[in-house]
Amino acid sequence: MIALLILSLACSVSAYRLQGFINAGILAYKNIQNGDEDDNDNIVFSPFGYSFSMFMSLLSASGNTRVELLNTMNLRKRDLGPAFTELISGLAKMKTSKYTYTDLTYQSFVDSTVCIKPSYYQQYHRFGLYRLNFRRDAVNKINSIVERRSGMSNVVDSTMLDDNTLWAIINTIYFKGTWQYPFDITKTHNASFTNKYGTKTVPMMNVVTKLQGNTITIDDEEYDMVRLLYKDANISMYLAIGDNMTHFTDSITPAKLEYWSSQLGNKMYNLKLPRFSIENKRDIKSIAEMMAPSMFNPDKASFKHMTRDPLYIYKMFQNVKIDVDEQGTVAEASTIMVATARSSPEELEFNTPFVFIIRHDITGFILFMGKVEYT
């Protein structure tokens, strides 16, 4: 059998058919968190990037591989076409403005020796299907195409490809957002951040403004949740803090996240949040194998909707980096806007481990999700 590489990269209320798509990414995150040997690690992951790569693999799959991937997406066979249409429609809703930039790209690189079915090529080539020789400078060619389309450089290296590679799927997500109400950089100060291993000093950002927030209860455990809006984008960062953040994460579903967000009311907050930067380069093959094991098995994988050639997936990576500062997420400098409180604001300080979720609120797509254990 021939091997396939899938690489998903990121740099940061859906139609009902895509609820399984969203949930697959959440489940992958949960498996990463619960499988981490060191629970003191920061995590950043792109649920959308993961689910998108799995969905595009589904479009090529057949037989039991197709069944497993349909189950992963909680789709019936007859819903696959409409779900793909809804996915593309959802992507179109992620508008870009001068304050917020969202760029999602998909590239499928297929070796020139693989015979692609004409029907597959006709249907999907416009989404970024490329032919090349993986034994002739494939790394540089792939990086050049991906950088031209996404602006990201050096997304693959020689350790990710070898002479057996005939197919590489690369999904990139780049998000740059400016806060609706930026933190006042003059108020950033050193403060304590405490986890179960001790206390350290971190740069603590501060803003006093009206935000959406509330205390939510999950199985008698309380969590403070607040929503930070990005300017002119329909994208928000949700922050949650409490005594048992693993329990909080394990409780997340698309429906619950939608419900929690609906319970957030407008309040004046004196919000204190650490400035943080996280980068994770992660092999996620074992995570995907939990959901669709046959596509990694050379004797069982089937991608006959794309080709009759015997292919299977042998590697799956995700590289993600996120920077959060006073201006926003992966942000450029912008004018500071600070609202002053008319009454005594509620103080909320994220000085213990917390979870963050960057979500496109119209579609429900979770672009990024992670936890901050230390900074």
Swiss-Prot record:
Instruction: Enumerate the SUPFAM superfamilies for this protein.
Output: Serpins (SSF56574)
Which keywords accompany this UniProt record? Host cell membrane, Host membrane, Hydrolase, Membrane, Protease, Signal, Virion
Gene3D superfamilies linked to this entry: Alpha-1-antitrypsin, domain 1, Antithrombin, subunit I, domain 2
The membrane-topology field of this record reads: Peripheral membrane protein
- As given in the record, the signal peptide range reads 1-15
Could you state one GO cellular component term attached to this entry? Answer: virion membrane
Gene Ontology molecular function terms on file? peptidase activity; serine-type endopeptidase inhibitor activity
SS bond list: none
Q: GO terms for biological process?
A: negative regulation of plasminogen activation; negative regulation of vascular wound healing; proteolysis
Cellular localisation: Virion membrane; Host cell membrane
Describe what upregulates or represses it. Answer: Expressed in the intermediate phase of the viral replicative cycle.
* UniProt function note: Negatively regulates superinfection and syncytium formation in infected host cells. Acts in concert with OPG185/A56 protein at the host cell membrane by interacting with and inhibiting the mature virion entry/fusion complex (EFC). This mechanism ensures that new virions released from the cell cannot enter already infected cells.
Q: Belongs to which family?
A: Belongs to the serpin family. Orthopoxvirus OPG040 subfamily.
Oligomer and partners: Interacts with OPG185/A56 protein.
Protein name (database record):
Superinfection exclusion protein
Question: What is the organism of origin for this protein?
Answer: Monkeypox virus
